[in-house]
Amino acid sequence: MPFKRLIKSIDIGRAAESQAEKFARAQGFTIVERNFRCKGGEIDLIARHGEHLVFIEVRHRSSDKFGSAAESITQKKQQRIILAANIYLQKKGLTNMPCRFDVIVGNLKSNTGFQWIPDAFSCW
């Protein structure tokens, strides 16, 4: 039944985001917001790290059958994240704050943990 698969997928996604948040905190990041949504897109985690505001995309795959988790972040997805980040910065009055876009990828079914990809893409 497709609806049950969708619910399971959402639950797995939330679990991956929770684990990624713990991973980010363990790396010294301070989480300031989770699941920021706006008309243009969504940002999974927003964190402070040193002087930077870091917009973090969390990707999870249960298998690499259709490509890796990192490969699933298309140019179009990057553009939506960048748009959402710009909206966030404007709403919070932080347009002069240095920022970057990181990615955390993982597989909840394996013991490989998470991989951090700093500066995974750029808005320039």
UniProtKB/Swiss-Prot annotation:
A family per Pfam: UPF0102
Intrachain S-S bonds: none
Organism: Hahella chejuensis (strain KCTC 2396)
Protein name: UPF0102 protein HCH_05895
One MF term in the entry's GO annotations: nucleic acid binding
Stated family: Belongs to the UPF0102 family.
